[in-house]
Amino acid sequence: MALTASKKRKLVLIRLVFRVFDVIPLCDKCATMQVALSEIETFMCDYGAHHSLVIYPYMPLIIFDFDNCLAPGNSVGEDILLPLFDVIESDKSNDLTPSMRQEMRLDFWRKPLDYIVEKYKFSKHSKSASYAYFSQLSIAHPIEGYEDTHLVHAFEGVKILVTSGFQKFQHSKIRQLGVEGAFEDIYYDDPGNPPRKGKAFYFDIIAKKYNTAPSEVWVIGDSEESEISAGNSLGMKTVQILRPGVKKSPKAQFHVSSLQEFLSLLQMS
């Protein structure tokens, strides 16, 4: 019987258990799971009567997005960007129709700044003003996430947060949402710190740091162009969370409407 990736991982863990207790397993790396399970059953019968043996379950590696995954993009309050909108919309060098202005304002809550600058062909003045504005931006008041945001603390395994945006602003949002302590590491794909590396760069670092095969890494977020695309490019398990206003993407391997659904998906995997 051929071993799948997950079964190979379990077999490695079983072999480590034997090594810890100075037991030499009879099976080699090509053995089937049936042989391995038979070994450990015999071992536990001999060992368990005299010792306490704890075998820990497989713990997943999960990469979370932040905006529109754990908190709405506009959770900070839309008034915070009004001064910047005034600068951009009063710049005569920007050829923005009323409908484009409306769409641009919406994009600021769901797209990274460099994408917006390119899409709407900002003048040098507006581009410079936008980067300067975001580089100093932060919030000092609590923000609200979704009804299920608190569940991020309930996920077992190694949880990593990778977010796009200016680090000072993003960090203040994460802190004010109260989820900073849920993660082992936080990475910022900061457009204000060129060259922009992209999320795939950080995803690859994470998989290597935690010695996890890409096919065993879970990625959850809302954006097809960002985390879903990055995860797919590395062969990771991509999950699109369909928060209000998020368009369902066929590129994601899985779709959930809430963190509770994602939690159930993990438990069944």
Residue ranges and their predicted role:
Residues 163-165:
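Conserved phosphate-coupling serine/threonine residues in phosphotransfer and NTP-handling enzymes
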Residues 31-34:
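Short polybasic linear motifs
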Residues 2-5, 12, 20:
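Short amphipathic, helix-prone segments within low-complexity/disordered or flexible regions
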Residues 56-147:
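N-terminal helical cap/lid subdomain that shapes the substrate entry/recognition surface
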Residues 24, 44-47, 52-60, 160, ...:
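Asp-based, Mg2+/Mn2+-dependent phosphohydrolase catalytic module
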Residues 6-9, 15, 38:
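Low-acidity, Ser/Thr- and Arg-rich intrinsically disordered low-complexity segments
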Residues 135-161, 200:
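Short, acidic loop-to-helix structural element flanking the phosphoryl-transfer center
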